[in-house]
Amino acid sequence: MKIKTIFTVLFTLIAFGLSAQSNTEGETFQLTKQGAHYVFTASINGTADATILVESGIPALLADSAFVFSSGILSDMELTVASKEKLSLAGRVYKITHKANGTVHIGNNTSYIGDVFVLSNYDYGPYEVAVPVMYLHDDLDDGSRIVSLDLGNHSLQMLGKASLNGIKADYSKSNMNTDTYEGMFAIETSMTLDDGIKPRTLSGNFMIDFGNPELLFLLHQTEEVQRFLADNADMELREATTPSGEVVGQFILTKQCQLCSIAFPDAVVVITKNLPLFTTPGNIGLKFFERTHAILDFDQSVVYLKGI
């Protein structure tokens, strides 16, 4: 009887341990939409809270110099003075005052690992820090890089491998790669738009761009887009203009745009010449992620998607 009781207790403890492990959830950050961007507030290195911009296309964690030195958030890192180095972002050029490389703790159980650039006059006020999500690590899951992004519910969560395995069957799966400008992550997929005449398809790499407020930008300079436009010469292209009348691009009004096998009715697809260095045919923007639940597994270069 005593042996049976011992085995029962052991089985219960083992089962509880496995259950606890499988249900371990990473840290969740509540997002706020600020203009055309998403931000969250979290402690940096346990020193001070910062407003943090969610980014996908920057090479390092960026921090405003005035905030860095007034708050002491990077006081434990070895900062090297940068000489005459600059960083161009969204048409603006910032002076890099200091650089570092290492681990920056964000919140309670999340870490950023990589380069750190301290910038002069980096939008101090709206946000103090910007972080590229592909370098966020889950401290509760052996440093895994799996980010669950649910912009519809204003949520960014670090998702453990066990949690992902339990839900990924409910999502469509696409591969990602970094065969792009500056090694940004892109989804290998296709876009099919229906403009009321016929469906038209463009396949290739579509870069993830949280700096793009639209559903999709097509990059005019790429061979794929040039071929797409030539093959669809009957498609109506409308001019995109500024309030002053300056033409800044073109756009296509669609009855439906299907991207990554998810349908977006009455979508607008923008054709731009303003991103001349980008090499992918398309950039997927925030309106896509506001209508989907995306799980980005940067360790395995896979994205799981589900429309909402």
Placement of each model-derived feature along the sequence:
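Bacterial Sec-dependent N-terminal signal peptides
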Residues: 1-25
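Pepsin/retropepsin-fold aspartyl endopeptidases
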Residues: 20-308
